[in-house]
Amino acid sequence: MPARVLNCKSIRLGSYGEKIEIREPEAATSTPESEVEMQRINFDEEVRVAIVGAGGYGRVALDVLLAGGIGDRVLGFYDDAHAALSGEVRGVPILGDVGMLKSMLSVEPVHVVVAITDNGARLQVANALRSLGARFLTSVHPEAYVSAVAVVGDGCVAAPGAIVQPDAALGSHCFLGPRSVVDRDAEVGAGTWISAGCVVGPAARVGARAVLGQNSSVGRKAVVDSDVEVGALRHVDREGG
């Protein structure tokens, strides 16, 4: 399913690379390369957006949507901890738990941003929603840059100043923090968290659900395995993280 893209003409959905988990198996796509080109949403039509997670990441995702000029299309937040939260975030209501969103998906289509900080939980929720027919919005802040020949999975969020260079590939539901860089030919697995100021070097490979800390770096052709956490300021220059 082509990525639903906000405010960026240069995102494609796809997966490649034999040695890295670009997308979770449950969310794998068999879309031919010829059909992989990004399809923009027509925001002149009625498009409704739901954000899963009303915490810090949810606020960041909302900020990206507001910057893209579609804040009025956001239905609200869904969070299993909604009872303990205030009733709204920046004027956007917290509508209920994820179960309520699942029920709504059975009635009408909604574009979803899964803004859960924990990588594993984010993918688990996304896969459950995908099985119910959810479509995922790939949200790129106007001040971020994504090359026209990069590949970005659906559900990713790119904060201000994030950069994705030519022929880089990111799996679904990744987060790119402010001023993070994914350099040319690099591959990043599904559900990975790339913190502010992090640099993934040329032809580096980062597995699924990894966490790259603030101002960390992954050297040219270096490898970070799935589920590995790279601490802030750390440099990885060898295979296996």
Model-derived segments and their meaning:
Residues I11-G87, K102-L105:
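Hydrophobic, well-ordered beta-alpha structural blocks that scaffold small-molecule cofactor pockets
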Residues E46, D72-V74, P109, G133, ...:
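A general structural motif
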